[in-house]
Design a protein with these regions (language model features):
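ABC ATPase nucleotide-binding domain
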Residues: 5, 26, 62, 246, ...
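Pre-Walker A (P-loop) beta-loop-beta motif of ABC nucleotide-binding domains
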Residues: 23-34
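Helix-to-loop junction immediately C-terminal to a conserved catalytic motif
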Residues: 51
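Glycine/charge-rich catalytic "coupling/switch" loops of P-loop NTPases
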Residues: 249-307, 337-366
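ABC ATPase nucleotide-binding domains
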Residues: 71-230
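ABC nucleotide-binding domain "signature motif"
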Residues: 57-67, 213
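The feature captures the beta-strand-to-loop junction immediately N-terminal to the Walker
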Residues: 36-38
Length: 366
């Protein structure tokens, strides 16, 4: 097991722009850390620097108390699981899992013991003598996980391991990886562009954009208290709604609509000097309620809007509408029989409102 420290890490491929820019992170022993962000944000590059597959341009990387910048990948005691499984097609499942142990010239009885234990853990015992082409995508990914497990490494690195699987298998494998971590308690860094994977799997999430960390926090913290507009829009599905508006006396004015702001939030905004100024107002789709559950405290934050699109998703309906020229999505109860072109009264739960500076897009906080 191990703690990891990444201190002021930079990666340049040329001298113009950093692919990874001043990355700072302390990973505690047994944590499951997820790097999440859009393509090209630097998450896989950071993971490859941890693995030793990319050189660190500047900064220090420690495993425990040992600085490992110049230590070869094979000597870092790290096991990596790749997106494309990286299995040898001519080898059996047993030999694929055992391959790294054989390279280290481990005694055959110990190899057999480790492979069989990993296979039992991953439900692969009956497939040990098959070759990868005879396995499903999920089974191949389990083999790749097994190869990492038998290493008994200090750290597991996983680079988009589920992206080649279909939706149903991804859900199943997410649960299996979580259970595996709970059992092994190995410090893990997991890279994904899928915010659902980040929210469901992580001890802490590291949200990245353009090579920079945007926010580090628990899934709950990142979801409920996004540091900026990017994080609010990237984490959560559907994404947070954003409106450009002006703070007036006790309300946010969005076009012709005025939504009452709770006194506590309004007091904080006044103290920060935002009274009478333009701000960005954010609210999640589940915090916009339909008229069936509008309570007294929401009366001053309700509007009647035309439905542009209504998507029935079983127990809920995604309603696409707009205030003035600004679109929004509301997630409402499927008890409504509603259709595009109709009008619906919805209320905004302003206790769940988020306010961001209109220029910096950073969250306004007390």
């Amino acid at each position: 097991m191990a703690e990891l420290r990444l201190e002021h890490i930079y990666k340049y491929y040329d001298q113009k722009e950093a692919a990874v820019d001043d990355f700072n992170l302390h990973i505690k022993d047994k944590e499951f850390i997820v790097f999440v962000g859009p393509s090209g944000c630097g998450k896989s590059t950071t993971l490859r620097m941890v693995a030793g597959l990319e050189d660190i341009t500047k900064g220090d990387f420690y495993i425990g108390d040992t600085r490992v910048n110049d230590i070869a990948p094979k000597d870092r005691d790290i096991a990596m699981v790749f997106q494309n499984y990286a299995l040898y097609p001519h080898m059996t499942v047993y030999d694929n899992i055992a391959f790294g142990l054989k390279l280290r010239k481990m005694p055959k009885p110990e190899i057999k013991k480790r492979v069989e234990e990993a296979a039992k853990m991953l439900g692969l015992t009956e497939y040990l003598h098959r070759k990868p082409k005879a396995l499903s995508g999920g089974q191949r990914q389990r083999v790749a996980l097994g190869r990492a497990i038998v290493r008994d490494a200090k750290v597991f690195l996983m680079d988009e391991p589920l992206s080649n699987l279909d939706a149903k298998l991804r859900v199943q494998m997410r649960a299996e990886i979580i259970k595996l971590h709970q059992r092994l308690q190995t410090t893990t860094i997991y890279v994904t562009h899928d915010q659902t994977e980040a929210l469901t799997m992580a001890t802490r999430i590291v949200v990245m954009k353009n090579g920079k960390i945007q926010q580090i926090g628990t899934p709950k913290d990142v979801y409920e208290h996004p540091e900026n507009v990017f994080v609010g829009g990237f984490i959560g599905s559907p994404a947070m709604n954003f409106f450009k508006g002006k703070l007036t006396d006790g309300a946010i004015q969005i076009g012709s609509a005025a939504l009452s702001v709770p006194e506590g939030k309004m007091k904080m905004l006044r103290e920060k000097g935002y009274a009478g100024k333009d701000v960005i107002f954010g609210i999640r789709p589940e915090d916009i309620h339909d008229e069936l559950i509008v309570v007294e405290s929401y009366k001053n934050s309700s509007i009647t809007a035309k439905i542009n699109v209504a998507e029935l998703l079983g127990s809920e309906i995604m309603v696409y509408s707009r205030i003035g020229d600004q679109d929004f999505i509301a997630r409402i109860d499927a008890r409504h029989d509603i259709h595009a072109g109709e009008e619906l009264t919805v209320a905004f739960d302003m206790n769940k409102a988020h306010f961001f500076d209109s220029e910096t897009e950073i969250r306004i906080r007390s």
